[in-house]
UniProtKB/Swiss-Prot annotation:
Matching InterPro entries: EF-hand-dom_pair, EF_Hand_1_Ca_BS, EF_hand_dom, Peflin/Sorcin_CaBP
Effect listed in the UniProt record for changing F122G: Increases interaction with PDCD6IP. Impairs interaction with ANXA11
Residues binding Mg(2+), per UniProt: D169, D171, D173, W175
Organism name: Homo sapiens
Gene3D superfamilies on file: EF-hand
Gene Ontology CC entries for this record: COPII vesicle coat; Cul3-RING ubiquitin ligase complex; cytoplasm; cytoplasmic vesicle; cytosol; endoplasmic reticulum; endoplasmic reticulum exit site; endoplasmic reticulum membrane
Outcome after substituting E47A: Loss of interaction with SEC31A and PLSCR3, and loss of localization to the endoplasmic reticulum
SUPFAM superfamilies the UniProt entry points to: EF-hand (SSF47473)
Name of the molecule in the record: Programmed cell death protein 6
Amino acid sequence: MAAYSYRPGPGAGPGPAAGAALPDQSFLWNVFQRVDKDRSGVISDTELQQALSNGTWTPFNPVTVRSIISMFDRENKAGVNFSEFTGVWKYITDWQNVFRTYDRDNSGMIDKNELKQALSGFGYRLSDQFHDILIRKFDRQGRGQIAFDDFIQGCIVLQRLTDIFRRYDTDQDGWIQVSYEQYLSMVFSIV
């Protein structure tokens, strides 16, 4: 299932811009049927995890898989039907393209400098110390780099935290004041 994989190799430079068109529906239906191992008409997180590759020959981060499923599962069925799967496919493909764009050395991993470039490209202005924190938090392999699946997870968490912060930053000055309970509510909403 090469369309799910990111395996760097010769000529694996930056991909097309995020937002590329979806492949043909019959192609996606064939992929959906192969991934739906139990033929339930719904792809579970386990089925999706087994179908995905992060390019490191390790299982795709289950937390990332559950996050993606929860974004697209409109009926709270702990999985995605075919219609929802087309959104999952596009979401993952768009992230692959972003990842390839910032994986400047085509290593299949994002190092600190590549992460800084990616997050800066997304509009974040963060300190070197914070980039170090992100690397430590999302580097499951302990190599000082982030794999594709963990890059997605890190970006999802950063976006959720940013959204929560913005709700409290009513004057948009980059500072908030919250009570301890508000802080706990913010943290528990993303855990």
